[in-house]
């Protein structure tokens, strides 16, 4: 099996993740597994149901992510990937966008795709 291009994989993942987040947050469940962990603004959450419950309970219904940068690195012997994202988060009805950073540690699945093993999200305050 040929090695996938990490930059192409991370770009495709980021596009899929944020378009799903912006339109159908429940649909993110398929990207996580029971061992997955989300740290959202310092709060650690583990497992698919808990992560999706957190993401769907955020105090806004509509938002749009605008991605500024995507950096990735191969991670470890298991062919994982670290993906670091920065950008702006525009909430419906808000004049000013919020700046955010998010880091994903993607791990391969036996089916040849990736799942989110670690996910760390922070708003960046000026």
Swiss-Prot record:
GO biological process, one term: protein import into nucleus
Broad class of where this protein is predominantly found: cytoplasm
Modified residues annotated as N-acetylserine in this record: 2
Location(s) in or outside the cell: Cytoplasm; Nucleus; Nucleus envelope
Disulphide bond pairs: none
Domain NTF2: 9-123
Superkingdom classification of source: Eukaryota
Gene Ontology CC: one annotated term: nuclear envelope
Tissue expression pattern: Expressed in roots, stems, leaves and flowers, and, at low levels, in siliques.
Family annotation (PANTHER family): NUCLEAR TRANSPORT FACTOR 2 (PTHR12612)
Function field: Facilitates protein transport into the nucleus. Interacts with various nucleoporins and with Ran-GDP. Could be part of a multicomponent system of cytosolic factors that assemble at the pore complex during nuclear import.
Name assigned to this protein: Nuclear transport factor 2B
Organism: Arabidopsis thaliana (Mouse-ear cress)
Gene name tied to this protein: NTF2B
